[in-house]
């Protein structure tokens, strides 16, 4: 049996770090644009940092949307969400920013994002934001 040795260097960017750094939300054409349906995505490992203390904040994100012409590619949303890991950002801002970025690329008929942050210091925070596409007159 051959032994494999893996060496790492602290100053070399890892491929996962590069993917996260370059992450962008990617969409593809909705395979059923004439049918209204909901997509539910759960992201249980969201992290960012408190802008005041620097402590990590952990949350489960629940994204529900009704696609119009585009659907978001799942790996891209995973990498995009992971890009917040080292950012110092308040719960309210990060929840709104994620929904704004999602809407900008996917242009859904409807989207709702719920960010359920783990309790810290006996405080449990849940932020919910929504978007509804305006109808053309």
UniProtKB/Swiss-Prot annotation:
Biological function: Catalyzes the NADPH-dependent reduction of 7-cyano-7-deazaguanine (preQ0) to 7-aminomethyl-7-deazaguanine (preQ1).
Taxon lineage: Bacteria, Bacillati, Cyanobacteriota, Cyanophyceae, Synechococcales
Name assigned to this protein: NADPH-dependent 7-cyano-7-deazaguanine reductase
Binding site for substrate: 72-74, 91-92
Root EC class: oxidoreductase
Pfam families tied to this protein: QueF (PF14489)
Chain ranges passing through the membrane: none
The gene coding this protein: queF
Key word ATP-binding present: no
Enzyme Commission code: 1.7.1.13
Family, similarity comment: Belongs to the GTP cyclohydrolase I family. QueF type 1 subfamily.
List of catalytic residues: 50 (thioimide intermediate), 57 (proton donor)
Main location: cytoplasm
InterPro entries: GTP-CH-I_C/QueF, NADPH_dep_7-cyano-7-deazaG_red, QueF, QueF_type1
Recorded GO MF terms: preQ1 synthase activity
């Amino acid at each position: 049996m051959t032994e494999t040795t893996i060496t790492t260097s602290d100053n070399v960017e890892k491929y996962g770090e590069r993917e996260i750094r370059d992450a962008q939300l990617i969409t593809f054409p909705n395979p059923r644009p004439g049918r209204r349906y909901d997509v539910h995505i759960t992201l249980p490992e969201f992290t960012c940092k408190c802008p005041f203390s620097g402590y990590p904040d952990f949350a489960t994100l629940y994204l529900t949307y009704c696609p119009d012409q585009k659907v978001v590619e799942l790996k891209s949303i995973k990498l995009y969400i992971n890009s917040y890991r080292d950012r110092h950002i308040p719960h309210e801002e990060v929840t709104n920013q994620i929904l704004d970025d999602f809407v900008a690329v996917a242009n859904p008929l409807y989207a709702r994002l719920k960010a359920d942050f783990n309790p810290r210091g006996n405080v449990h925070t849940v932020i919910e934001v929504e978007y509804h596409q305006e109808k053309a007159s």
